[in-house]
Amino acid sequence: SVDEASPLGSGPYVMESDTRLVRNANWWQTAAPIVDFDEISLTLVEKTSEVRDNFEYENVNLVLTDPNSAAFAGFHNDYELWDAKSPIMQYVGYNINSKVFSNYGLRSAITYAIDREHIATDIMGGFAQAAVLPASPDAPFYDVKLANTYSYSLTKFQQQLESASVEDMDHDGTLDLYVSSLGYAVPVSGTMIVCSSSYQRVEAATEVVNALNALGFKLTLKTMELSEYRQALQTGNFDLYYGEIRLSNNFDLSPFFSVYGSMCYGGLDDSVMLNLCNQ
């Protein structure tokens, strides 16, 4: 899109080259942009340390950095911090082929057991928003009323377990689930995997596992290097996983439900859901 007069998402500035932005004469707004410069110079870097060094040595005035990213660079000079919204979503995914987590009622119960506000505030340092629905709470189509019906509630969690006939049947401290295909009950146990490249995601996944185990689950968290993590997702070698995705700006979820989707793991492909995404 560099060669286009108005590349998508260029806003008040347009790319003239890899290292230079200039005022966009075709900008759709009549108001003056937030910054009043005729041009903005860009600095190309390859490493996180180069981002840090260029900023600390005042070679650049502004950097975009994600405190929750594995590539986050910490800065030691004085600076002003602005919060920029993004469509990055962290979430818990399930293996629909798991003998335990194939149970819809059990998965629904977990929705009420995760304190998203705590994770966003205390683990992500406030650089995240708690969202029950798979979109930003600031999005115009985010249904707050609907989201509130699925928010953190241990009372609703227990009610959902009862509806799914999940209980500690042998009184050993671990919840049990009757599996009709097996003809007997099995413990609500399994393995959650998370990529070890991000300390923040490992910490968040640990919080989820600990919270569920305190409620009667028997989950094990397994951290994996990126290549091993991807392999486990692609082969379905997991019960749950803690993931992250940068969604499109309209929060399109089709990559999860298309059989060829980039995020379709654990038998999640669903033509009905895919059609809903495409409407």
What do these predicted regions represent?
Residues E80-N95, Y265-N275:
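Periplasmic-binding protein-like
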Residues S1-V35, E39, S49, L154-Q159:
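Gly/Pro-rich hinge or "lid" segments in bacterial periplasmic/extracellular proteins
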Residues S49-V60, F75-H76, Y104-G105, T206-L215, ...:
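Short helices/loops that flank or line small-molecule/ion binding pockets
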Residues A71-D83, G236-N237, N250-C264:
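Ligand-binding "clamshell"
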Residues G11-V14, T19-R20, F37-L44, V186-S196, ...:
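Short, well-ordered beta-strand elements
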Residues N26-A73, K218-T220:
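Ligand-site clamp/hinge motif
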Residues S108, A120-T121, A214, T220-Y229, ...:
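Extracytoplasmic/peripheral linker and loop segments enriched in polar/acidic and small residues
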Residues R20-R23, S102-N210:
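Append "and occasionally in soluble cytosolic enzymes with long acidic Gly/Pro-rich linkers
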